[in-house]
Amino acid sequence: MTKYFHFLDVATGEYFSVADESLNNAKAIAHENFADPVFCGILDEEEVDILGEDVY
């Protein structure tokens, strides 16, 4: 089941989400795309839509 892992890129102050089944995979994707991502929690699809964040 796909989850939305919520991150903050400390370097830019940008919040974003990674859609994946595994936190480890999500962290790897976050580190590939951002300089200093910090995991903040898990969101559901509705919360991601409301926030309007980029999803990777």
Annotate the PLM regions.
Residues 1-14:
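Short aromatic-glycine-(Arg/Gly/Cys) micro-motifs in beta-strand/loop hairpins
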